[in-house]
Amino acid sequence: MAQIPARGDCSRQLTRKQAGDAWEAAARRWLESKGLRFIAANVRERGGEIDLIMRDGKTTVFVEVRYRRSGLYGGAAASVTRSKQHKLLHTARLWLARQNGSFDTVDCRFDVLAFTGNEIEWFRDAFNDHS
């Protein structure tokens, strides 16, 4: 298993952007250790950004990475609101179109990798375009 940054290593001494980049890099390493292949990071399309795009076999996986210091207020996973899900779906739709694909032609899913303190939770298929 990939080494997870210790509490404070990413979030206290670094800027918010640097901390986000560090957690996304940790997420990428962790997912690669689970057999997923890296496709892209920080993919920006009009109206949104996808943290990681990975491949799990033939499935394209859009990954939202979240970090919270503690589980108060629901922890990291709870911060992926319905509004955020819609933005991710929209961004993925645009990215797929640039790849000459769509939700109808490409097997894909949306995962959330949530770091709460030093704990990792991997929510496979956390939501979809039918949610």
Swiss-Prot record:
Database matches in Pfam families: UPF0102
Highest taxon above the source species: Bacteria
Family listed: Belongs to the UPF0102 family.
Coiled-coil ranges (or none): none
Organism, as annotated: Salmonella typhimurium (strain LT2 / SGSC1412 / ATCC 700720)
Protein's name in the database: UPF0102 protein YraN
Molecular function GO terms recorded: nucleic acid binding
